[in-house]
Amino acid sequence: MLYHRIEDWDDAYANGVNIPRGERWPDAWVEPSQSFRASLEAQDRARFDLSYGSAPRNRFDLFMPEGAPRGLVVFVHGGFWLRLDKSFWSHLAAGSLAHGYAVAMLAYTL
C-alpha cells in the first residue's frame, strides 16, 4: 500500500491551483448565481440564510421546485475549506429543481 505524507494541509486542499485558469471560475459564477437566486426569490421558491447551527456561517439557502418536492438534495459547496460560500453555486441547483427536488445549499465555517 502506498501512503502519501501530507506536510502542508492548506496546500493539499488548494485544488484551484491545479486547474488551468482555475482562478477565473468564481467570478464567472457570480452573475448566473445572482440571476438564479433573484428569479427563484421572485417566484417565492427561495429562502436565504436559514440557520442550522450557532456559528456565523452555519447557514443554508433553500430552493424549492414547482409543486411538492420529491426529496431534498443537500449541496455542500467546493472551496476546499479555504474560500467562497454558498452564494457562488446557487445556479447549480437548477437541474435538481427541474426534476422535482428541493435543494439546500450549505455554507460552513472555513
Predicted regions, residues:
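Conserved HGGG/HGGXW glycine-rich cap/lid loop of the alpha/beta-hydrolase fold
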Residues: 83
